[in-house]
Amino acid sequence: GFSTLYINARIFDVKSDFHKTVGEKMAVRNEKGEPYRETYGPEHFTVNCPSDTLWRDYLLDTAEFCVKAYGCDGIYLDQLASAEPFACYCAEHSHENIGEFNNGYVYVLRELLRRLRKHNPNAYIMTENCGDIYGSYTWGNLTWNGAEYDEYYNVFKYTFPEFVQVNMVNPRGWE
């Protein structure tokens, strides 16, 4: 067998003790300067900016630490290939323009794979859902469909048979 550790690569819980000091700084900002917010079940989050070095470096360092300290084989980056990218208008962030969201994650995946393989040459990255822009850096994807969706995972599997696809079925609702 092999072990995979979980990291949410996208959101920050607003109830966290660190949201006011760190989470607010990492948040993607809309054109009014407000952070993008999302709700999953009863919990509320801000969306982190993957093209800003603050979040990017924290994510990379945490994932590398997991492989180095715990000896796990891979890292699962939740939401990375699944959720909507946003333009970030935060002038304090390190990105050069507002549209670098996806490029930020490409950098994370490329750099993370390089770092992980220093510690374990067989290390791998998994993400939630399939993103062809990210696929050359991942070993596999956790895929799922809601009742209203057909995101064509069978077509993806047919087109890219070398990718591992874990199909999740989760019938429980938030109610």
Each predicted region: which residue ranges?
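Active-site-proximal loop/short-helix segments
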Residues: 76-98
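Carboxylate/His-rich catalytic cores and anion/metal-binding grooves
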Residues: 2-18
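Conserved, mostly hydrophobic/aromatic
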Residues: 59, 66, 78, 125
